[in-house]
Amino acid sequence: MPSTPLSAAVEALSEDAAQARHAELSRAIERANQLYYNEDAPELTDAEYDALRQELEAIEARFPALTGTTEASAGVGAKPSEKFAKVRHAVPMLSLGNAFADEDVDEFVARVRRFLNLPAEESVAFTAEPKIDGLSLSLRYEAGRLVTAATRGDGEVGENVTANALTVDDIPETLSGENIPEVLEVRGEVYLSHEDFAAINARQEAAGKPLFANPRNAAAGSLRQLDPAITASRPLRFFAYAWGEVSEPFTDTQSAVLERFRGWGLPVNPRTKLCRSAEEMIAHYRTIEAERAGLGYDIDGVVYKVDDLGFQRRLGFVSRAPRWALAHKFAAQEAITELLAIDINVGRTGSLNPLARLKPVTVGGVVVSNATLHNEGYVQGVGADGEPIREGRDIRVGDTVIVVRAGDVIPKVRDVVIEKRPADAVPYVFPDTCPACGSRAVRELNPRTKKLDAIRRCTGGLICPAQGVERLKHFVSRNGFDLEGFGQTYIEVLFEAGLVKQPADLFRLEFEPLKAAIVARRETLSAQRRSEGEPAPKKPTKKKGEEEDKAIKNLLASLDARRTIPLNRFLFALGIPQIGESTAKALAKRFPDMPSLMAALEAATREQAGRDWLELSALPRIGPGTRDRLFETLDPLPGEAMQDLSLGARLRGRLTPSQREAVLAHYGSEEKVDAALERAASQRPGDAYRLFADDGEIGPVATDSLIQFFSEPHNDAAVRALLEEVGTEPLATTTSAAAFAGKTVVFTGSLEKMTRSEAKATAERLGAKVSGSVSAKTDLVVAGPGAGSKLKDAEKHGVKVVSEDDWLAMLAEA
């Protein structure tokens, strides 16, 4: 597949730059998910969101250790709102991988064929249907009657909106027809037509109420009403396109499922077509794109799905999306406007994030007044790798800029119209002190690239209120300690009052100081209102006072209820960069408690790689893989043994001519190359470091982040103080597939009944770790015809060896 500007940019990223950019993208995506799924008030277009997601996935493809390290990477959608009862989906509602070019569709079809190991003469059919821009909904029917309707939520848990769904004319309360499964979960999309959207906004305007930004927001806001009467007053519509749990199989192809849906009284999009090649799929995409303006409802692409359900089951899932489906998105939308100002906010990890204040402009039907500028390097026209972007054009206040929306994430400034730059426009100078705490703000030298990081960070750590408050908010969040009642306002009040500066302080709170802080905040707000001419609020009644006391006691009770917490939640709550829910779970599976983990990290810190080792992987035509292979053994190889060479000269001789040329250009002479290689050999990471870094679920990026976090004395002290107040318990594990959970499996030789990719995916789905080499830590070797050295290694280490048939039998029992 040809290189794209995005792929080229990602290829140029160092590990540190990739980690920083991944974290930045994750924050933007997580914020966008919250605004899109829970608040129905997105700040970005679909195209902008997809661009962020595409960049995130491109980084993860090149740096696999980053996969699953953040909520944006591991999750789908956003956590469900507290306003509604929760519904756990029997089958998760996953997202889809995206395509933005015809080549992506070609590669998708080829990837499906490779995974299934299909002969050239065997065709694969795909359905192609419009991708409705609405709100995903799951309808559960039992004995043909609707019993539950739930939103997607975070993919695992959604919101119960059954009463509202029953007011939608397109959603049948009772299915009709024959052979309806006893249990049937129907997945589809709730949407509004353009005509109905215009009528709703006209009513909103007449009533003096805010207008909806677009039909998707209006549909989502209408379905997620606490009062079903409001939902009933808005003519929502529904298309069915998928299913979740079913009590028994009812057909064998995707297209036949849609026909069954239609026969049972469920509306199905009439523009769905069965295609038998990538060419047919792309042709249908072009047809839908041409019809888009006249459809009468919003779509943002075309969804392709493998038609054969047997193939779908074999293909399975990867991360948050099925391998057998793809969303081919329409192009991003752009507009030109003026950059009025650049504001700086401080992120939870101390990053100084520039935000563009724009002259309001409509992009794709939404008014945009803010856009991200990513980081200092981006403003200066320099990429994360230190190389020029936008041909080196910087961004200045007063510039005419191109703003792009690529999804429901915050818009971004893509470029500058340099011809329209005012004569008095001057380069923007980033502050060298933190706007929140006044501490120095620095751009550190990246040891891998020898260039300044793109992001400027505050050095204030826990003394910085911007970081402190945000870290505490993260700590008490639902996926962290889940402290009931401790919303953002309480955290701000307690922080400003000086009662809580670090997590341990929460568990030391007492009734009287807590009440005093709340009362003081209320009095401050009252004084502000009086100064602004507002009438003073009434004094609290005795009853109100009793209710307040009860609420404070409930807060303290919620703290006591979290004195013991699973280790993975403890780790996630600390807010360590790159330690998302997935990585926290991986660490909790490997260590029983925090003291064990911290001791292992102390050892890993002592055996961390040195600067010369890291520098090698940043050189052209070297990279981490070549570097690791180069130093696999320091002993002389057969051809080297006859020569009287230094270690550095031997290592240099193992390089290809182009690699030798690259290192010579960097270091200047063969003597300096040899010296650098010898220094690198002495700085290789030790086993204690590799225990983390070589683990496929943790990886070097997360490992370095853990080491950096615990190497800061104030962080180490804060964690130890917290451990004096709370305890941890081991990660709860499920009993299903226990035979494979945590086991290390190696596949060798030819597999005849499934592809290697399919075997690997199946093992990992059951909780096993798949390795490429056999060691004493390997639990099982699956050997097919032609197995070679790995069989001998298995015998040497006493590892159990089974055939492919034995493996399949074990899977059947799992």
From Swiss-Prot:
This is DNA ligase. GO terms for molecular function: DNA ligase (NAD+) activity; metal ion binding. InterPro entries: BRCT_dom, BRCT_dom_sf, DisA/LigA_HHH, DNA_ligase, DNA_ligase_AS, DNA_ligase_CS, DNAligase_adenylation, DNAligase_N. It comes from Methylorubrum extorquens (strain PA1). Zn(2+) binds at C434, C437, C458, C464. Its cofactor is Mg(2+); Mn(2+). HAMAP family: DNA_ligase_A. It is an enzyme of class 6 (ligase). The gene is ligA. PANTHER family: CHROMOSOME TRANSMISSION FIDELITY FACTOR 18 (PTHR23389), DNA LIGASE (PTHR23389:SF9).
